[in-house]
Amino acid sequence: MSTEIKTQVVVLGAGPAGYSAAFRCADLGLETVIVERYSTLGGVCLNVGCIPSKALLHVAKVIEEAKALAEHGIVFGEPKTDIDKIRTWKEKVITQLTGGLAGMAKGRKVKVVNGLGKFTGANTLEVEGENGKTVINFDNAIIAAGSRPIQLPFIPHEDPRVWDSTDALELKSVPKRMLVMGGGIIGLEMGTVYHALGSEIDVVEMFDQVIPAADKDVVKVFTKRIRKKFNLMLETKVTAVEAKEDGIYVSMEGKKAPVEAQRYDAVLVAIGRVPNGKNLDAGKAGVEVDDRGFIRVDKQMRTNVPHIFAIGDIVGQPMLAHKGVHEGHVAAEVISGLKHYFDPKVIPSIAYTEPEVAWVGLTEKEAKEKGISYETATFPWAASGRAIASDCADGMTKLIFDKETHRVIGGAIVGTNGGELLGEIGLAIEMGCDAEDIALTIHAHPTLHESVGLAAEVFEGSITDLPNAKAKKK
């Protein structure tokens, strides 16, 4: 069966970038169609990414906190985990959110076509779905087709014991021993979940630190904590992976590499993601796709074809949902005739581990690369009353300032709920705040977020909660 649709805007992909673009188009009075390969809206993020991982991380955090309370006189005993019930709860979270999106699409009269969409011309798209073929004729298109996990040719990905992030989130079993390939955000988050559920976790990372994008001093605080949970093998890489009946055997080389191949019950490959740009027949619409699968756009999210836009993971790093959402708004607004641009000063990044690692703006590494003279100020959570009282004193808040103007240009927080505390730093950078602005803003006490104000006081030399190196000597 074949059907044909005519619309003002078609959005290819219904992840956070895609559905945000589609809903914004509808709100601006544009007839809009979404094409989505999943049976529900939300894309990778909501169905097999950001949201289910946070649901499982919440479970992991509660398990770890319950164990930690034994030192303070409250003993719950060993937790008994029922992974079927945990999985059911995770699916309930997803269903609630996807149902909400479906309701909003219906309320906005956004038509949803399920299936795999590919371009057949500059103004036509063909969708192969369970109910047959749908041809969509459009005036404007927004490509929001996302990304997928990287696969390496020497790894037997077809073996059910070799996982990508989607497999790990299915929570089919809890392996006794698990290897995480890649010390980035996804791998560390999944390692956190499975460690809490009882797995022995090894992490192999080719760089000299996990979370390579963050500054060393920030990661050092994090690493000190997670070494109690994970066996970290830094400056080490995997050279061979062999599937045998009794396990997955992994050979490594490097600074921390074991001499012999190691046997694992599961191997999580979390070495990054690749864009889906080559899977869309975009060339038939005249859209240029580079060798890696990325689609180049301008600040209005236009591709080289003026009426076709691209947003989200497919346009480049960072591959983050919140970046894609804002790009989607811009694309929709430009199509509607508004002169809007995607020009953020900062895009925050967060590892939702325990402790969380969050940063926004320039890191020290980036400031050096740009030739910017800067100074840093840090406030250790070991001096925070709220952190000590909450048993999370192994954290740190760091601010980076322009040396001449004293404006904040970057910041990082490592500690419990660090991602929830990062917003003030991002807003401060967007608004052009300097150290004095932050230091003179009265922060509630005792809180974790007051550490941002206290870090600014360290820079200003007005700190009284720490020894003051800038105090005048008598």
What are these model-derived regions, one by one?
Residues 10-12, 117, 136-146, 180-181, ...:
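Short hydrophobic core segments
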Residues 13-16, 181-184, 313:
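Glycine-rich Rossmann-fold phosphate-binding loop(s) that bind the pyrophosphate
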Residues 158-176, 262-335:
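FAD-site-proximal beta/loop scaffold in flavoenzymes
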Residues 2-7, 17, 23-31, 36-174, ...:
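Glycine-rich flavin
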Residues 10-21, 26-38, 44, 51, ...:
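Flexible, glycine-rich terminal cap/loop adjacent to redox cofactors
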Residues 50, 145-200, 204, 232, ...:
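Glycine-rich dinucleotide-binding loop and its adjacent helix/turn
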